[in-house]
Amino acid sequence: MSATIGSAASGVNEAFRRCLSAARLRRFPSKHPRNASFPAAGALPIVQGMNIVCLLGSPSEPSRSAGLLDHARSLLEPHATRIDTIRVRDLPAEALLHARFDDPAIAAVRKRIHRARLVIVATPIYKAAYSGLLKSLLDLLPQDGLAGRTVLPLATGGSPAHLLALEYALKPVLAALGARDIADGVYATDRQIERLPDGRHRLDEATEARLARIVGELVERLAPQRAGARLPAELRWAL
């Protein structure tokens, strides 16, 4: 597990809990009276056996895409048994540049993705496309390398003009790798992610709320799948 993000993530977690509660109220409005009392949102079930792999495609350190990924991880950590972050910049450059499929480090990445239930892909957007560093790794995955996995795309860029790169550049490649369950992505501009003096990052309110909503929906959807059965009503309402 990664180190605790700290106080900067506390607001994200609170927004996450509010979004989870609101999502359940919208989904089952007729089954409970308005004044019914429900379990606290903090009672979310731990998703036993859910492995998560994060692919960070930023060539820079530190980076805002890493900060966005860190916040997503902090929301998911209570609901996963393992989260691994693969920083593509730390993989052997020669293996990436020369497309060495048999390199041990690349083979290890493929194995970790194969064991994952959820794959998070985080990248900066350069010239209306995801990073070339990320592309060099995706090219070394098998054609069905993301089949059967839920994928959450995250991206950062200099301006709102790059927002469409998430939909028209990154998501089609993920689909070409077999991903059929691609969550709504989160895109944030540099102005929406503040870099703090201690190296952490703080999201603005809109980005924080969107990330909390999307991650909350993922937890709600994946928890019953991993448990192998529908959650009891009291736990479903805790979501």
Positions of predicted regions on the chain:
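Helix-loop-strand module that forms the ligand-binding subsite of alpha/beta enzymes
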Residues: 101, 105-178
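Short, positively charged and aromatic/hydrophobic N-terminal segments
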Residues: 24, 45-46
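N-terminal beta-loop-helix "entrance" segment that forms/cooperates
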Residues: 85-104, 194-198
